[in-house]
Amino acid sequence: MARYVFITGGVVSSLGKGIAAAALAALLQARGYRVRIRKLDPYLNVDPGTMSPYQHGEVFVTDDGAETDLDLGHYERFTGRPANQQDNITTGRIYRNIIEKERRGDYLGATVQVIPHVTDEIKNFVLEGNEDYDFVLCEIGGTVGDIEAMPFLEAIRQLGNELPRGTAVYIHLTLMPYIPAAGELKTKPTQHSVKELRSIGIAPDILLVRADREIPESERRKLSLFCNVRESAVIQALDVATIYDVPIAYHKEGLDSEVLSAFGIDPAPKPRMDRWEEVSNRLHNPEGEVTIAIVGKYTGLKDAYKSLIEALYHGGLANKVKVNLDWIEAEVFESEDPAPYLEKVHGILVPGGFGERGAEGKILAAKFARERKVPYFGICFGMQMACIEAARNLVGIENASSTEFGPTKEPVVGLMTEWLKGNMLEKRASAGDLGGTMRLGAYEAALKSGSKIAEIYGSTDISERHRHRYEVNIDYKERLESAGLNFAGMSPDGVLPETVEYPDHPWFIGVQYHPELKSRPFEPHPLFASFIEAAIEQSRLV
């Protein structure tokens, strides 16, 4: 039977519940347990697919095409277990499910209410499909006290009573702020947060306390006394240099042992931490460094590129180098020469994005990389802009563009439905729904034998995750290839371009998919490992 760990947050948001859940899962895995992590998001959106990156950060896409919270990326990277649609639920999805059931008459005329109908739907989500796991970790989004989170907290309170005794543990993540004027850490915010949680009917078993410095024993005893938690269960969560240091830090503080003890499980033997220690050692003792320019449009919020950042660091791990990131807003290149920004970097990465803003800047970044022989990695939108750049400057199609930006006579990039569906042209209404209208999830691709990208993968058959509405128009394939841009990867039916590259360039690759979503610290994605390797070579030239 699965045991359940419910992780809540208090005082402020963005304390790192997702990292805490992922780190605990990694520690339990290191002891040989089978672990699943689920995220319960209180917002009313059905999923984050149509939310602004500035509001929500990255949308993490799973193999089965779910658009989910970025925390699921942490779960995958720390545990190696692919997430799926059933690992993330939102209030919006819950309400939609309930309304559909009500319309079908499933409730037999009953008045539909938050309790029991909404809470039952949440509980069903938490309990479903856990037969093959020893532990199920459930992260509750938001902060205790938020009105949106109340149904979720009520649901996990009920589960504490309904599950067999000894199979549910509650962890509360809080903040102990340091007040410089007083020269001390303050326990009062945590006390009030726990008081709020207890008023709901949830008594935390473990306090995980974020702080920027060591918490004195006297303050731990104080928290233990006023929050009614064992002193050994007041665990400090100090700031660390990288997220990959967190499992080691939490193990040293005894989090995994305390969780097992709370379940009545002997915490011996110790977990095997070898691979985490190796990752930490490589991060803290690099043998060199490279600088990668990220030419994007959401650079004001780094969480919009969370998986991308981590995948670049993984590429650094594979090559034992530190990866420095130079963030450049693409729009800058529309009014300024890219050269001063790009001539000293060792690689240029143009990530995915939506809309016309910054597109011309990304095209100029691709042009600079092509002409100056600087390693270039174009992902999704970055591949599309590289193809438009080639069409304009190598093929001579001056007005080459994308239908994403408006009507154009030369749609080098467009909705695939605009040129092909069977053999019929299809139009999508510009005012139609955006949600659920993209190519999402894992799709196979066939790579050309002998191409650079096939050599990097070590295979001609791959499967990668997608998230896009627009594709490079296959009608331009022949002209672009004649100009030197090789379409090295296509969908198995030969209809949709998946990868492009310049054979005469040291490293210039564009991919329509998102390889960053499948990179892990212990298994860096081969494209990122190769890109950083090319950047190391470039660093010897500049």
Curated annotation (Swiss-Prot):
Binding site residues for UTP: S13, K186, T187, K188, P189, T190, Q191, K222
Region annotation (Amidoligase domain) ranges: 1-265
Active site positions: C380, H514, E516
Binding site for Mg(2+): D71, E139
Recorded coiled-coil stretches: none
GO cellular component: cytosol
Activity regulation (UniProt): Allosterically activated by GTP, when glutamine is the substrate; GTP has no effect on the reaction when ammonia is the substrate. The allosteric effector GTP functions by stabilizing the protein conformation that binds the tetrahedral intermediate(s) formed during glutamine hydrolysis. Inhibited by the product CTP, via allosteric rather than competitive inhibition.
Chain positions recorded as CTP binding sites: S13, D146, I147, E148, K186, T187, K188, P189, T190, Q191, K222
Domain Glutamine amidotransferase type-1: 291-541
Amino-acid positions noted as binding ATP in the UniProt annotation, renumbered to this chain: S14, L15, G16, K17, G18, I19, D71
Keywords: ATP-binding, Glutamine amidotransferase, Ligase, Magnesium, Metal-binding, Nucleotide-binding, Pyrimidine biosynthesis
EC number: 6.3.4.2
Residues engaged in binding L-glutamine: Y54, G353, F381, G382, M383, Q384, E404, R469
Pathway annotation: Pyrimidine metabolism; CTP biosynthesis via de novo pathway; CTP from UDP: step 2/2
Catalysed reactions listed for this entry: UTP + L-glutamine + ATP + H2O = CTP + L-glutamate + ADP + phosphate + 2 H(+); L-glutamine + H2O = L-glutamate + NH4(+); UTP + NH4(+) + ATP = CTP + ADP + phosphate + 2 H(+)
Anything else known: CTPSs have evolved a hybrid strategy for distinguishing between UTP and CTP. The overlapping regions of the product feedback inhibitory and substrate sites recognize a common feature in both compounds, the triphosphate moiety. To differentiate isosteric substrate and product pyrimidine rings, an additional pocket far from the expected kinase/ligase catalytic site, specifically recognizes the cytosine and ribose portions of the product inhibitor.
UniProt record similarity statement: Belongs to the CTP synthase family.
Quaternary assembly: Homotetramer.
Function of the molecule: Catalyzes the ATP-dependent amination of UTP to CTP with either L-glutamine or ammonia as the source of nitrogen. Regulates intracellular CTP levels through interactions with the four ribonucleotide triphosphates.
NCBIfam families: PRK05380.1, PyrG
Family annotation (HAMAP family): PyrG
Name of the molecule in the record: CTP synthase
Species for this entry: Brucella anthropi (strain ATCC 49188 / DSM 6882 / CCUG 24695 / JCM 21032 / LMG 3331 / NBRC 15819 / NCTC 12168 / Alc 37)
